[in-house]
């Protein structure tokens, strides 16, 4: 499940679930099977989770940036976390545009950081199952990204099963350090 007006990049599968005609219409073929809901709408999320038992994950930007600055209600991510846990669906927070201090907090999703279970942005601590970071990770000086999650998720992919053109780049890692 993804949100309308999302922006998660420009790779083939990601473009497949874009709702921006300028990004999608002349680029394909598209990967099928994505479900769209309005950003900030937990009622729509729960409705889709109830109807489709094959949903694996919900990918969300804590604050949408490409669609304007679309800030959801303060308890939105807390409700998302609860629904994802209730329906055994991974919560994936895409913090590429919002993470690492770009919103005034370490993370806009307020998870996987030392905020003592509270945050100035939200009324409660929210920890996504998967956290995606980039851009600010190197201070904008060199391309680097990171996918953070617990080992029970990460170890589903075994060495050699998946590759990355720029993965494992020691120079980029030293810049991010």
Language-model-derived ranges and their functions:
Residues 1-177:
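Conserved N-terminal phosphate-binding loop of PLP-dependent enzymes in the Aspartate aminotransferase
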């Amino acid at each position: 499940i993804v949100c309308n007006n999302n922006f998660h990049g420009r790779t083939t599968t990601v473009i497949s679930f874009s709702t921006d005609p300028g990004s999608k219409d002349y680029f394909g073929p598209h990967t099928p099977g994505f479900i769209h809901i309005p950003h900030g709408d937990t009622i729509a999320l729960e409705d889709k989770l109830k109807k489709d038992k094959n949903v694996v994950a919900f990918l969300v930007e804590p604050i949408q940036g490409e669609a304007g600055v679309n800030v959801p209600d303060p308890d939105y991510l807390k409700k998302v976390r609860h629904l994802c846990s209730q329906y055994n669906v991974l919560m994936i927070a895409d913090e590429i545009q919002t993470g690492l201090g770009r919103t005034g907090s370490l993370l806009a999703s307020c998870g996987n950081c030392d905020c003592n279970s509270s945050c100035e942005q939200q009324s409660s601590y929210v920890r996504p199952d998967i956290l995606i970071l980039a851009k600010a990770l190197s201070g904008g000086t060199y391309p680097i990204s990171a996918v953070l999650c617990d080992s029970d998720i990460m170890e589903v992919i075994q060495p050699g099963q998946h590759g990355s053109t720029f993965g494992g780049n020691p120079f980029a890692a030293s810049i991010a350090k």
